[in-house]
């Protein structure tokens, strides 16, 4: 496998082509952003930690029957992945009220929800990734109802698997967001699963072990990510 030119650079990752048209190299950066890029900073070794956490969690999910774009971890910052066409939606899964949902609905942060909540947002930086519903997504040509049904099914499997896994590590999976990619007629879990994309709270202390520490200037951001890596790597 030969790494080629950079195809795309996002907030947290760079994507490079390879000599195989069906694969890409994903490079994890230390850059940190919040509030749709309004707040910027760096977290030392974040890319290294998120690359490892994502690789381990994607391997776990593959074993549980969730198809992903992940092929293998190449080095401490890079992984080889299938070259998917990203559906321009984020699927957000919420088990406990927190963040924007708690604020939007006037709920106390930490309230256990009576059922898992599934939301979608339109991946569009210019619009600040607005929440939309299924009908919006289909009406403006982003996806189909059949594809959405499959995306929600993938999200539910990911939630069930990760909730159980993190529970065993003494962590509450509060909420998370995922991206889905199209590849040879299939839908695959793509992007990453890490403290950048999940809210993870210590079960016994309630301590936040995720990017909220950066968003809210709570300090000890690197230490929180290291703690998640340590527990995932048990």
From Swiss-Prot:
Going by the UniProt record, its keywords in alphabetical order are:
ATP-binding, Ligase, Nucleotide-binding, Purine biosynthesis
EC class, as a word, reads: ligase
UniProt-listed Pfam families:
SAICAR_synt
State one molecular function term (GO).
Answer: phosphoribosylaminoimidazolesuccinocarboxamide synthase activity
What's the EC number here?
6.3.2.6
Q: Which InterPro entries match?
A: SAICAR_synt/ADE2_N, SAICAR_synt_PurC, SAICAR_synth, SAICAR_synthetase, SAICAR_synthetase_CS
**Which pathway is this protein assigned to?**
Purine metabolism; IMP biosynthesis via de novo pathway; 5-amino-1-(5-phospho-D-ribosyl)imidazole-4-carboxamide from 5-amino-1-(5-phospho-D-ribosyl)imidazole-4-carboxylate: step 1/2
- Which GO BP terms apply? 'de novo' IMP biosynthetic process; cobalamin biosynthetic process
Task: Give the reactions, separated by semicolons, that this protein catalyses.
Answer: 5-amino-1-(5-phospho-D-ribosyl)imidazole-4-carboxylate + L-aspartate + ATP = (2S)-2-[5-amino-1-(5-phospho-beta-D-ribosyl)imidazole-4-carboxamido]succinate + ADP + phosphate + 2 H(+)
Alphabetized HAMAP family for the sequence:
SAICAR_synth
Family statement drawn from the similarity comment of this UniProt entry = Belongs to the SAICAR synthetase family.
Record-linked PANTHER family: MULTIFUNCTIONAL PROTEIN ADE2, SI:DKEY-6E2.2
Q: What's the name of the protein?
A: Phosphoribosylaminoimidazole-succinocarboxamide synthase
Organism expressing this protein natively: Clostridium botulinum (strain Okra / Type B1)
């Amino acid at each position: 496998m030969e790494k080629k030119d950079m195809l795309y650079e996002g907030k947290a990752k760079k994507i490079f082509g390879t000599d195989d048209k069906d694969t890409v190299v994903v490079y994890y950066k230390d850059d940190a952003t919040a509030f749709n890029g309004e707040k910027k900073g760096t977290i030392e070794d974040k890319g290294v930690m998120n690359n490892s956490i994502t690789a381990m969690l994607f391997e776990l999910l593959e074993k549980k029957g969730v198809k992903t774009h992940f092929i293998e971890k190449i080095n401490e910052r890079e992984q080889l992945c299938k070259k998917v066409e990203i559906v321009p939606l984020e699927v957000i899964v919420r088990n406990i009220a927190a963040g924007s949902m708690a604020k939007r609905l006037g709920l106390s942060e930490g309230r256990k929800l009576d059922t898992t909540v599934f939301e979608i947002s339109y991946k569009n930086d210019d619009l600040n990734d607005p929440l939309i519903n299924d009908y919006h997504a289909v009406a403006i040509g982003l996806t189909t109802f059949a594809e959405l049904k499959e995306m929600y099914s993938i999200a539910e499997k990911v939630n069930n698997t990760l909730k159980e896994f993190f529970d065993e590590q003494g962590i509450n999976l509060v909420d998370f967001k995922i991206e889905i990619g199209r590849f040879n007629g299939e839908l695959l879990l793509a992007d990453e699963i890490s403290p950048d994309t999940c809210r993870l709270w210590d079960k016994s202390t309630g301590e936040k072990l995720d990017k909220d520490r950066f968003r809210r200037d709570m300090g000890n951001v690197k230490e929180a990510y290291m703690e998640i890596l340590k527990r995932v790597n048990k």
